[in-house]
């Protein structure tokens, strides 16, 4: 595979290999055949980052080969959304002959939505001034004249210039309801929007008929907690990143959801609060004991759950675990399987044509 060519004819074969690999990894814990969710074969990534290479009067996007570290010129990127591909061409054309915009530009980041909005961030090794802003505004206006719904941001050391805003609003059809999600530049969002819809619908399916409340750790912008709110009496969710918490609060209001409470704290801190080890001012006014959480949802970073959080989640009758790293999931299952059994298993092909797998498990207490 090269950045400008996807082996789409090999899609089914690479997916079949992942199914076999996941089943093998899960064999000590479950003999379930994974429910398999396919990605679009191209234009599935809604965000992408590229270094910018200056070559005389020319400049272009590059990525680095993971093995050889050699640079690869990228003029089109079929893994990314069609809007990113349009913007890649338009941005280079707009920057190439403009000294204010091209000087010391070293990276461009793209974030797009299925609703055809984009935030483009230009990263510089120089101070950004009013002349830069004026030229960037002219570029933005030229892009919009091409019917590209785009917001531009300039970044340099300790500097961030938003020409309009640093977010876009995604609209996803999820099990018969349109969900609105504010996505903030430089914050985590699910990279494959089509796959995200399938993940949300799978999570809704495995939790239908749930009793009581839901606790979610690592909630981000509320991606899962807001979609799952319809299946539970109440949802209590934690997140540490300030921009993500702010986006989650916006998303609660935008979706007219009244049964979700977001707390800004780390999963490890919340574990201490639940266990009565420490008290936190951030929890004033929130009666943790009033929540009857029968289900806990975790979508941890690649490192998986730490040992204290492992112990904490074992106290819940049902554990819904979305993993971007099945190796750490299996490590966690060595502990979790002592008290819980795997009821559902899913493979989400979030990153086609790569080694990476995303998976989901529903665990119920033995």
From Swiss-Prot:
CDD domains: AdoMet_MTases
Reactions the enzyme catalyzes: uridine(54) in tRNA + S-adenosyl-L-methionine = 5-methyluridine(54) in tRNA + S-adenosyl-L-homocysteine + H(+); uridine(341) in tmRNA + S-adenosyl-L-methionine = 5-methyluridine(341) in tmRNA + S-adenosyl-L-homocysteine + H(+)
Any GO CC annotation of this UniProt entry: cytosol
SUPFAM superfamilies associated with the record: S-adenosyl-L-methionine-dependent methyltransferases
Keywords tagged on the record: Methyltransferase, S-adenosyl-L-methionine, Transferase, tRNA processing
EC number, as in UniProt: 2.1.1.-, 2.1.1.35
UniProt GO molecular function: rRNA binding; tRNA (uracil(54)-C5)-methyltransferase activity, S-adenosyl methionine-dependent; tRNA binding
Enzyme class: transferase
Family membership noted in the UniProt record: Belongs to the class I-like SAM-binding methyltransferase superfamily. RNA M5U methyltransferase family. TrmA subfamily.
NCBIfam families referenced in this protein's UniProt entry, alphabetically: trmA_only (TIGR02143)
Protein name: tRNA/tmRNA (uracil-C(5))-methyltransferase
Gene it is expressed from: trmA
